[in-house]
């Protein structure tokens, strides 16, 4: 039995007068390259300008930290520059779905105003193309 395939239906103006804000997001590329590190339980993470995000979880958590010379670096995209209603649905899904279709791995952290989506630095060209084809704008 073959796995199901999924096609994303994009609503047109003929379907409905509303256009989802999730379908056309501006993603700003944050300066620098980042590494993902496991947060050690009980050890405080330095809160200097080099730490982008810290996530605490059942496993201890993780840290997104800037390290421009890292061998396995990640690039950070930010979707929080444009205001959107807090009850807007599908914001993150609209970003990660086209990347998943293209086999581009992601690591994500949420902030109050938006999401940080990390993609491997060696796959940025492919990721940017997938995102643009999905209707998003990627800007430096």
Question: Where is each model-derived feature located?
Answer:
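A short glycine-rich beta-strand->turn/loop micro-motif centered on a GG-aromatic cluster
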Residues: 105-114
